[in-house]
Amino acid sequence: MANLRTQKRLAASVLKCGKRKVWMDPNEISEISNANSRQNIRKLVKDGLVIRKPNLMHSRFRIRKTHAAKRLGRHTGYGKRKGTAEARMPSTVVWMRRQRVLRRLLRKYRESGKIDKHLYHTLYLEAKGNTFKHKRALIEHIQRAKAEANRTKLIQEQQDARRARAKAARQRRAKAVEEKREQIYTAAEKIEE
């Protein structure tokens, strides 16, 4: 078998790749061995006797499979962990994510009119003060606050109505007393006459 080291080197130079990427047709070795210049190699490339091999793919199938399993909680036990809990998921990042979720919810509720700007501001500061552990806690708090506000409003209206009725009754009684007094005075005047 002929030594094709020179031809391989020239082919790598012509094809602008490494020597391991150069393929030479094993059936045409005699013709390839006669090529001793770049020009001849270019002709062989054109004829298809010398070819540049395609790049090898680096499959991500296995890593995708592992990621899918990790999302389900596999391969994440104590034995698989290298860093501290803080290094793996910094508490600052957890805090920022939670605040962004809560503030986005508050903004959405304010824009849709579910809460007014005063309640928004109060809840914003409470969220900043770590009152709410998660989104559901905030939603439940808002529902309770609205229910409490409605209850307070209803009680206030009932008290106002009761006061109005009591005032009307007082006025009626006072009017009746006044009329009775007038009758007594008129009767007394008639008797005196």
UniProtKB/Swiss-Prot annotation:
Residues 157-179 are annotated as: Disordered. GO terms for molecular function: RNA binding; structural constituent of ribosome. Residues 164-174 have a biased composition (Basic residues). GO terms for cellular component: cytosol; cytosolic large ribosomal subunit; preribosome. Pfam families: Ribosomal_L19e (PF01280), Ribosomal_L19e_C (PF25476). Keywords: Cytoplasm, Ribonucleoprotein, Ribosomal protein. Component of the ribosome, a large ribonucleoprotein complex responsible for the synthesis of proteins in the cell. The small ribosomal subunit (SSU) binds messenger RNAs (mRNAs) and translates the encoded message by selecting cognate aminoacyl-transfer RNA (tRNA) molecules. The large subunit (LSU) contains the ribosomal catalytic site termed the peptidyl transferase center (PTC), which catalyzes the formation of peptide bonds, thereby polymerizing the amino acids delivered by tRNAs into a polypeptide chain. There are 2 genes for eL19 in S.pombe. Belongs to the eukaryotic ribosomal protein eL19 family. This is Large ribosomal subunit protein eL19B. It comes from Schizosaccharomyces pombe (strain 972 / ATCC 24843).
